[in-house]
Amino acid sequence: MASAAVESFVTKQLDLLELERDAEVEERRSWQENISLKELQSRGVCLLKLQVSSQRTGLYGRLLVTFEPRRYGSAAALPSNSFTSGDIVGLYDAANEGSQLATGILTRVTQKSVTVAFDESHDFQLSLDRENSYRLLKLANDVTYRRLKKALIALKKYHSGPASSLIEVLFGRSAPSPASEIHPLTFFNTCLDTSQKEAVLFALSQKELAIIHGPPGTGKTTTVVEIILQAVKQGLKVLCCAPSNIAVDNLVERLALCKQRILRLGHPARLLESIQQHSLDAVLARSDSAQIVADIRKDIDQVFVKNKKTQDKREKSNFRNEIKLLRKELKEREEAAMLESLTSANVVLATNTGASADGPLKLLPESYFDVVVIDECAQALEASCWIPLLKARKCILAGDHKQLPPTTVSHKAALAGLSLSLMERLAEEYGARVVRTLTVQYRMHQAIMRWASDTMYLGQLTAHSSVARHLLRDLPGVAATEETGVPLLLVDTAGCGLFELEEEDEQSKGNPGEVRLVSLHIQALVDAGVPARDIAVVSPYNLQVDLLRQSLVHRHPELEIKSVDGFQGREKEAVILSFVRSNRKGEVGFLAEDRRINVAVTRARRHVAVICDSRTVNNHAFLKTLVEYFTQHGEVRTAFEYLDDIVPENYSHENSQGSSHAATKPQGPATSTRTGSQRQEGGQEAAAPARQGRKKPAGKSLASEAPSQPSLNGGSPEGVESQDGVDHFRAMIVEFMASKKMQLEFPPSLNSHDRLRVHQIAEEHGLRHDSSGEGKRRFITVSKRAPRPRAALGPPAGTGGPAPLQPVPPTPAQTEQPPREQRGPDQPDLRTLHLERLQRVRSAQGQPASKEQQASGQQKLPEKKKKKAKGHPATDLPTEEDFEALVSAAVKADNTCGFAKCTAGVTTLGQFCQLCSRRYCLSHHLPEIHGCGERARAHARQRISREGVLYAGSGTKNGSLDPAKRAQLQRRLDKKLSELSNQRTSRRKERGT
């Protein structure tokens, strides 16, 4: 009789599974009721307008039907979809939206067709006409839930059998038995490290339970394979399971290399092509009875065709009876062949649910297996683990409960305990008595590993010497650049206005700004020689994954873009993470799952780039540790370094001639804090020695962390960044403007934040500023702008032309110009040209010299020097009134985008802003982008107040009067009409008299 603990567990699990099932059914129902078929097809869960192309009989007499798009001319291809082999689908008639004809399993999916396997029970109900149109819709998996419930009920009723002692241990009714002695082993894999060898010995010596905890990259699968091989060597029969087909196939591939007799159970459609030779189908096809089975199938196909052709009811009945007899014989012969195949295999592999009693394993005795191995146990529902556990006296669980938990649809069921895996429950209950942890990882650079080790694995992990310092630049054909020379890169979007999409009807989240940053970083890696196939882009949100695919797949077909859940167990040389969340509320939502972030970061081998808004993610403690770690041990960049047209928060034209100055406004006092977009590059062990002096103290949050301010000679005094550093750069630039020098170079010792400051200050003063060089040799050159276009029309050197004057630093009034006077670096200042022209006219009127004398540059020079002495900011220009040059400059200004730094032409495509009377390109035509945001809002408020129209199409304000006021006006009108009528009556009487 089952214990109280078992009964309580089974009752609770059945209730939670019912919640989960109801949630999944409700989700599928909402798809069908609330979403159009076209929308379902665009989401990839439905295929419309299909026709039947072929039918045949498959394994176990199943009917295989191939569907393809209905052709209208040339051959058509299927639309983009998420259908994969093994999915359960419903077949519908296109003419009848609500009627489901049958359910089946996808066996093959290509770009032009899909093949569905239907059970034999559908054969006679299905009458598929090649001329009709059909559709396929993904369905919830009823089979899985039925098997889970069946296993729980079997656990509750379990009295005596091979798993009795194991059940007592797993539910805490008895302690694990003492370990047995193991003779010294000869390992099949001679490259195992100490922790792996210890785990193998421990697993083999335990009598009921052993847990192998394998953090990312520690060779967990290698260890599990060694355990299986050693068990087979001892003469044990092993049942090896995992929650997913991919995990099982991975074990099959590894065991096949060791020449073991293995058998893979499962639907043929769900197996990788590389291991199908080890599947039950393939083994049966190679058996002695294969030809007889093939002949019986052929007979079934022939009788089935005859049944379709005949119209006689008696003949149809005879054909059906014949098919039933043939299928019975087919089943008997297949079962005999299956039993022979099962008993000849040393290792049988299947998914947890594939090991159920209603599958091929029902042919074996109850105590056939000696040990059950469950890989990736931490990702499996505990109920699914009990399907194989009831078949053996000992179990070995392997996985990592610090990574993703089992996937569930019902949030309520997950919180109530459905997401608690068997491995996590037992590890917390028994601890080191049953757990062995692998400690040497063979995947990640030590800088990538250390964060995960410290935050998730108690600092137990160490990097193997072969991977401890490997970088992208060490790959063959990859150049050494800033991107390929760092293992950790943080691109901070804080303060850049790259907010997430706010779609009320979207459950998922997206961020187009981060998509652009990802694209630019990938291009930098590819340009450096990193193959796109070695790069992965990972995001926690499916909507962001879709946006990334739309933007990147056509340029980089080999690039892999997946969600975090879809990438667990995988690895790439470079991984780019898009965290998506960027909002003023500081909500992180889905990112709050610590284990999901652990999985995302630990997929990378040599380089991981995190793109996020530090101001948002720092609201979550765990994410804050990640940002702080990248800040201290990696390179930090702001999104401003990637995107030229970023619109920072609080953007305004009022205080500068460019966008950079407004972007640098901190949220707090300028002397003590700065925004997250202005982070300093952090030092790292694998970076250049110059960066080592810029490491920041540990334990401080990113928001309050103070970067070091390096001096121009390469020093890096510690302390909080103050206004003095900015003032130092500003003083240098002002001194340069007052000097006769035309160019000023800043040394390469500046970090990225200092370079950003220099760019901003140079832009404020209207100077040119360019960054040159790569890596440690990157420096900034600030230069004075070339003379105005009119200077080119003056006389050549040596002909008495005017000598060029040095630029004069602009006054505060000049730096605070209104928005309409914003201009790009190559656009002439029309206001200055106009003032110079007026000055020349006045000068000509006050000087009685001849026109020839006025045209002489040498006679004009003394007067200009005199005017300069009086403090007028005039610029030396030729004395001729070049009206054509003025017109040409005006035309050029009208044909160029008015946004600072933008030189795009607006002759063909451009938008005119009525607020500032300038033309802008399509990237900058919105008032909020080019600096007219406040004016646009004021204009909109005035229009709404005047017209009563909130937005286009909302209609106008009701113009009807208030009823009381209308009645009052009506009374006044009636009174006035009465008075006028009385006046006319009195006049008539007077005339009559």
Curated annotation (Swiss-Prot):
Task: Summarize the impact of residue 221 to A.
Answer: In HMNR1; severe reduction of ATPase activity and loss of helicase activity on RNA duplices
Residue positions of the PTM N-acetylalanine?
2
Localization (cell):
Nucleus; Cytoplasm; Cell projection, Axon
Among the Pfam families in the record, one is: R3H
Q: Zinc finger, AN1-type: residue spans?
A: 891-940
Q: Which EC number(s) does the record attach to this protein?
A: 3.6.4.12, 3.6.4.13
- EC class (word): hydrolase
> The organism sits in which domain of life?
Eukaryota
Q: What is its main location?
A: nucleus
Where is the region Disordered? 651-723, 782-828, 841-879, 971-993
Under the heading PROSITE patterns, the entry gives:
R3H, ZF_AN1
- Which residues participate in Zn(2+) 2 binding? 913, 916, 930, 932
User: Per the record, what are the reactions this protein catalyses?
Assistant: ATP + H2O = ADP + phosphate + H(+)
Q: Could you tell me one molecular function GO term of this UniProt entry?
A: ATP binding
Impact after mutating residue 196 to R: In HMNR1; severe reduction of ATPase activity and loss of helicase activity on RNA duplices
What would changing residue 603 to H do, according to UniProt? In HMNR1; severe reduction of ATPase activity and loss of helicase activity on RNA duplices
Any transmembrane segments, and where? none
The UniProt keyword set, sorted, is:
Acetylation, Activator, ATP-binding, Cell projection, Charcot-Marie-Tooth disease, Cytoplasm, Disease variant, DNA-binding, Helicase, Hydrolase, Metal-binding, Neurodegeneration, Neuropathy, Nucleotide-binding, Nucleus, Ribonucleoprotein, RNA-binding, Transcription, Transcription regulation, tRNA-binding, Zinc, Zinc-finger
The record's disulfide annotation reads none
From the record, which residues define motif Nuclear localization signal? 864-868
User: Signal peptide: which range, if any?
Assistant: none
Q: Region SS DNA-binding: which residues?
A: 638-785
What clinical condition does the entry mention? Neuronopathy, distal hereditary motor, autosomal recessive 1: A form of distal hereditary motor neuronopathy, a heterogeneous group of neuromuscular disorders caused by selective degeneration of motor neurons in the anterior horn of the spinal cord, without sensory deficit in the posterior horn. The overall clinical picture consists of a classical distal muscular atrophy syndrome in the legs without clinical sensory loss. The disease starts with weakness and wasting of distal muscles of the anterior tibial and peroneal compartments of the legs. Charcot-Marie-Tooth disease, axonal, type 2S: An axonal form of Charcot-Marie-Tooth disease, a disorder of the peripheral nervous system, characterized by progressive weakness and atrophy, initially of the peroneal muscles and later of the distal muscles of the arms. Charcot-Marie-Tooth disease is classified in two main groups on the basis of electrophysiologic properties and histopathology: primary peripheral demyelinating neuropathies (designated CMT1 when they are dominantly inherited) and primary peripheral axonal neuropathies (CMT2).
Notes concerning its domains = The R3H domain recognizes phosphorylated 5'-ends of single-stranded nucleic acids which promotes binding of nucleic acids and stimulates ATPase activity.
Q: Which named protein is this?
A: DNA-binding protein SMUBP-2
Q: Which species is listed as the source?
A: Homo sapiens (Human)
Cite the source lineage: Eukaryota, Metazoa, Chordata, Craniata, Vertebrata
UniProt gene name: IGHMBP2
